[in-house]
């Protein structure tokens, strides 16, 4: 275990005891790793090992890292460390997400740009150059941050989505989709950001909870007058529609009803209104409590009726418009049961209008403002125009006066409304031309391949991710922007000679354009043009469409684009040897592991899966952790303005990275829950694990700083127990880490620190004082193995402990402990754990009755099944609890009784009506427990999972229950004068031991004592004189009046001299 190049040194000598300065210790480790190049050594030692493929999702480097990155980064460090110790080679290549609107918006902010026209004025080349510089602005800060959190990554071999090689793989992927018929252009209604002047994909609206924000909008109920036709019964009546987007009313081209809904024609004053019968009560204020119903119709009866639109702008030009159409999407949950249709501004609207050949009208420009086709509102932003549109309808002024639409109700409607996840402005829905991936063509296959992925938490597979896949829609991948990978589509500029060319490589571009691009970004790629080969006149030109890819297409291409596949590394990626096509080698696709927060189920996880299915017909990854969200101290989203979270750097400087790592990793957040960051929570993690481990190491360093070796062949029961307990920890940690249950692994480690420090070390203290070799070697072995087991979870503190104990180079260059290295003894573990439970329960009784630990008590009854197995440990229990007599018994029912409860939810489906009879019997206390674990409850027998039990003490004042109802302990708290005297002596022993420490004596130093005792305590002191002397290592112990004395307690004064 030792190495002369790395001699054993007490690395934490100045930090032992009290309160170690963990940040200072961590700084030592980080410096050591840097100088030793330990990370590269950990990779190199596995050069010939099988690989474990980890995909590191690329962050943006134009902003500083936050708690979300910190949390995910810890997981990205823990899993590769564990897999490396298990014998795998795990490359940890860092990547940077550099394209897209996040980068553009940051540059716009820096340059004071407020709209796209300013970008066009400055020039695309200049703007994109500013983006290129901006996206890598904080790389040094990122590297410092990642290094400080003790995360090992390869920055030197990083990839960037702006690299030419990366972008070539991205356009290759699109060309593959095009060749498979899975990419197409279409005119559709999409979520649209008027601030950024580009559409979004539907999955971007579902990534974060805060994309939908509560918003108040004006809602209007409006009547459109029915025109004459073949049926005259409704002429002059008003079709009532309800909308929360009044700005779309100038674009109205139809209304929709549900064919199977019942509608009524009612009279209100001198007007008639048509609406769904189910919505009458909602409009009682306007129509009356019992309006006169003139006629009743099915929705199907209303189809084809024509009406006058609320505005005249498109009345003459729109074909097949202004009629009642069928719509299965129409409901009677709100509104009137009749839906206003503006095809350019609603998905259902466009689909409904398309069926009858209604061509959408689009009077709103790319900035979200009305154009000249609606002169009354020209230049007004749609949200600002709402107020004037409503005023005109109410006052029957302007264009709204022509067709006589009736404004029946104007109200404020509060509802969740989508906002741009990048600029945070409210979106609109708008018909635009976009390029799509035909996800619906292979959606079922995506659902099938999802079953091959292991998800943590497990419910994500068929829950949030699986359900999203089932409803997946075609993905809009084009963005009307500048800084991104260009969509490699060239079109003829003459519609009379149409042609589309799609390119998937630099070679293909060079072949057709005669030049090999060295930069695929705009505007350089836009400059590649050529004559249209299909135009015999030779006048038309092939020009690239101006769009760039959705940034999620970039990141979804990461597995292959990072290695420039298929242009390079195809053997590495696919797992075939180029020299021998029949020889299979390690494939690097799919990846073995990825992790991000749960929102990526509709972001990166989703786009990875889409492209993997479409391109390779397999998943992109085998295992995925989708963790919860980190919240501020007030339970809300973290906010710099609210200052509702502690500064990460301050936590690192005060508590250290391992403390933060433990707090995050041990929490429920890795099982899908959310986590509130609190400083007390971080410190509690230190108290639970870091300090106990450090104190155990300090204990060994104090008593045996230069000795101790690996040793498991021991005879003392406490040594055997802690080694067997360590074997259990090894198995439990291995099981948890194999399934990426990191929080479960943390819990196992936390549970181990209790028996290690509060049982083994405390019960073995005297053996260490005596320099017992077995005890020293056992603790050495436990610390060496525990450091290895905890190394992925606490890489910094374990490095110090392991190197100090062994003298080795690094704990992170060791192997994961094997099962056969440690002696397993499940029987000993079970019985000693029960001994500890007995002691814990009895100690709780002492505490509740305010009986100090050093006061002896006469008797403890331990009532448990198979109580005799505790007999060898009676002395240990008595000594631990300071109780004179331990009585063992199997007669639990003498001291308590079991109360049973039927689990009706589990038992009901099997028992039917009999479950009620069982409940009645059990409530009456007549249930009978059977040896096989079943419970007889009257006419039925309940299985173990169909009921629960609770052990209730007969005399709770003196009785405590053991965990899981396994037994009871009953404490006799009678205190005799003899017991009180012994307790007094033990109190003085503790005070004298503290005095020894105070004056700086070594634990082995002998002393002489002169003690002055009050007269009423003199007899107690004489009786227990030898006992006190022996415990404090006094070779001389006399009574008298010391000249130079110290008061220690209960009127006692002493003088103490080293021999």
Swiss-Prot record:
Binding, ATP = 640
Task: Place the motif 'HIGH' region on the sequence.
Answer: 59-69
Entry superkingdom: Bacteria
- Which reactions appear under catalytic activity for this entry? tRNA(Ile) + L-isoleucine + ATP = L-isoleucyl-tRNA(Ile) + AMP + diphosphate
InterPro entries per the UniProt record, alphabetical: aa-tRNA-synth_I_CS, aa-tRNA-synth_Ia, Anticodon_Ile_ABEc, Ile-tRNA-ligase, Ile-tRNA-ligase_type2, M/V/L/I-tRNA-synth_anticd-bd, Rossmann-like_a/b/a_fold, tRNAsynth_Ia_anticodon-bd
Pfam families, per the entry = Anticodon_1 (PF08264), DUF5915 (PF19302), tRNA-synt_1 (PF00133)
- Judged by the first EC level, this protein's enzyme class is ligase
Q: What is its EC number?
A: 6.1.1.5
Q: Which GO terms describe its cellular component?
A: cytoplasm
Q: Name one GO molecular function term.
A: tRNA binding
Q: Which residues form a coiled coil?
A: none
The prosthetic group or cofactor this protein requires is:
Zn(2+)
- The short motif 'KMSKS' region is annotated over 637-641
Q: List, in alphabetical order, the GO biological process terms annotated in this UniProt record.
A: isoleucyl-tRNA aminoacylation
Q: How does it assemble?
A: Monomer.
Please state which protein family the record places this protein in.
Answer: Belongs to the class-I aminoacyl-tRNA synthetase family. IleS type 2 subfamily.
This protein is called Isoleucine--tRNA ligase
What is the species of this protein?
A: Mycobacterium leprae (strain TN)
Lineage of source species: Bacteria, Bacillati, Actinomycetota, Actinomycetes, Mycobacteriales
- What gene does this protein come from? ileS
